[in-house]
Amino acid sequence: MKKLVLLPLLFLFVHNLNGQIFKDKYIKDATKVANIWLEQINNNNYSEAYNQYSEKVKENSDSTYWLKAIDQLMVEFGIFKSRKISSSKFENTIEGLGDGFYVFLEYESIYKNIKRCDEYILLGQNDKFKWKILRYDFSYESNELDPEKELPNQGN
């Protein structure tokens, strides 16, 4: 009787372990793609970065507009200093996108002109099993309102 109870438990354990191994591999592979993509942006290779977007994104966007927007953003951010992953997550379904393999990555980044920048990347695996960028977003704190930053003399 004990063997009959242990067998399903063993099956569930092996199945969950297998699933976790694949999730970890998907996250690792997607992270490599995202890191290369971010490096392309930080090195002003915007056209190469744009080509890493999924076909659906490229069909629904204007590459000229995106290239100008990302260039302006990087000028505003200033020179890239450092970046580390703060969270990563695998999902097999996303509302509005359907079933598939998706990885969310969140980075804590530092650029010359901003205190801290959180960068968010969503990647999806296409039908050729290649990871592609689906979305890039960010939030940041500007140095402009830094109380520690000296204000210009206002003639006091």
Where are these regions (language model features)?
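Sec-dependent N-terminal signal peptides
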Residues: 4-15
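Exposed beta-sheet edge and beta->alpha loop/turn motif
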Residues: 88-156
